Amino acid sequence: NRYVEDEIWPFLYSKIVDGKSGDIVYEHLAVNKRLLPNQNIDGSTWMRIWSMSKLVTISLAMDLMEEGLFYLDDPVHKYIPEFSNLMVAVNSNGESISRSRKVDLDCPHDVVNMDSIMTIQHLFNHTAGFYYALTPSKCLNEQIDSSKLLQAENGNQLIDLLSNLPLIQHPGEAYFYGLNTSVLGLLLERVTGTSLRQIFIDRIGKPAKLKELAYTKPKGIELLPTFTGR
């Protein structure tokens, strides 16, 4: 609750439901009324889950992997050939950007060929080399911002845009949090020939009768506003 009071979080809501009986075991709500003065929040409120969607994608991937559709050590380019020749951004000393000190990050960066094969396991554990526009490198941040990834209309467009961006490191070199799970979702679409949304519906949504989680906003629903924490 202190994080909500200090405006680090605009609100906090949690609920635990008994999977068999449907009874609510635990429920708690805290709202910062300055940030959300007129907002009613309860168990029926639709909200973005942001990076918690990674749990959904990884669960779907594990389900498909158990059926033998792919394996952790499979090369990513086996399913996304557009990623066969990805380049890696390096500093003037030839070190990958993820391992560079800030003083070594003069723009523009050189790029080199990958020195290892990117596998599906690298996507799982965030060592593939994909990133968000939050890196120590101004160059990479500007490149990913200007690439307009969020404007991609489908998975194939997103793959094409990503294929033109350098990786921040060689696959498997180190942990670097980024778009790796999103790429895993694109790979699942290639493996199954259907959308990630439909994979979720078929494998989690319908079997679990889960109506409270969706990839598209239900009609007539207004989502909670977004905030930048401090």
Task: For the regions a language model picked out, list residue spans one by one.
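Short, flexible loop/turn elements at secondary-structure junctions
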Residues: 18, 34, 51, 124-128, ...
